[in-house]
């Protein structure tokens, strides 16, 4: 089993330190508004700002490691990951360190679950979430009584999400993938993103797929 945790650990430690320090700064500058009521306009700003800041800090591993030295390209690659778009600016994916490939797949895994959490937690506050549609369409008891608390829902979704990822990893290993490739493809597949660790994507493993025709016995 390949130990990809040993690559670029100082780069990722620096990225994490920058992100945590920036988070503390933002929290310190906004502590006076801790108990302020969030209005619809503030909600839009939080959603847009959250995506932008998440992508900006998510670009740091590419930039600091030198895997993608250009800010524009690193930002695009990270945004593509978090939004599970699947587009990439990389020509030779296999030349990247495996720790960077793992982070690249993880952006899609986080983004895939982030979309769900955004839908059930943020968008309803803006008046455009699923709860409004549920309230308008569902007869009988109110939606609040039928819908569990957001935190409980998020925990259950995360449990299902992680479980499916583990199960797919096991199946991909049984199909012939290495543990590293299986983990990465499970994270990207479960998020419907499409990032791969190979230049040919799943085509790299076509040699493992054997299609056999049933033998016909002559009468």
Which residues are covered by each model-predicted region?
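N-terminal alpha-helical transmembrane segments of multi-pass membrane transport
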Residues: 1-73
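Interfacial loop-to-helix junctions that mark the boundaries of transmembrane helices
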Residues: 4-14, 103-107, 201-209
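Cytosolic juxtamembrane amphipathic/interface segments immediately preceding
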Residues: 33-38, 96, 138-153
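Alpha-helical membrane-interface segments at transmembrane helix boundaries
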Residues: 45, 107, 147-155
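Transmembrane-helix bundle segments that line or gate the permeation/cavity pathway
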Residues: 51-136, 156-185, 193, 216
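Membrane-water interface at loop-to-transmembrane-helix junctions
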Residues: 149-158, 204-208
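A structural feature that tracks compact, well-ordered secondary-structure segments
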Residues: 188-189, 193, 198-201
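Single conserved hydrophobic/aromatic residue that forms the stacking wall/gate
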Residues: 209-219
């Amino acid at each position: 089993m390949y130990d990809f945790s040993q690559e670029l650990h100082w780069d990722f430690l620096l990225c994490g330190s920058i992100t945590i320090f920036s988070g503390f700064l933002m929290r310190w500058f906004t502590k006076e508004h801790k108990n302020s009521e969030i209005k619809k306009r503030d909600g839009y700003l939080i959603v847009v700002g959250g995506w932008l800041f998440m992508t900006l800090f998510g670009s740091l591993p590419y930039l600091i490691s030198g895997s993608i030295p250009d800010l524009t390209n690193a930002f695009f690659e990270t945004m593509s990951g978090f939004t599970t778009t699947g587009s990439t600016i990389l020509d030779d994916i296999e030349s990247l360190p495996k720790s960077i490939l793992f982070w690249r797949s993880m952006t899609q895994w986080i983004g895939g679950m982030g979309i769900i959490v955004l839908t059930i937690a943020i968008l309803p506050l803006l008046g455009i979430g699923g709860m409004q549609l549920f309230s308008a369409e569902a007869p009988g008891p109110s939606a609040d009584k039928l819908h569990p608390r957001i935190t409980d829902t998020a925990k259950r979704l995360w449990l299902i999400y992680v479980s499916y990822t583990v199960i797919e990893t096991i199946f991909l290993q049984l199909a012939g993938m290495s543990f590293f490739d299986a983990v990465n493809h499970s994270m990207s597949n479960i998020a419907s993103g499409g990032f791969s660790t190979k230049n040919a994507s799943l085509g790299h493993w076509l040699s493992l797929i054997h299609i056999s025709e049933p033998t016909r016995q002559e009468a």
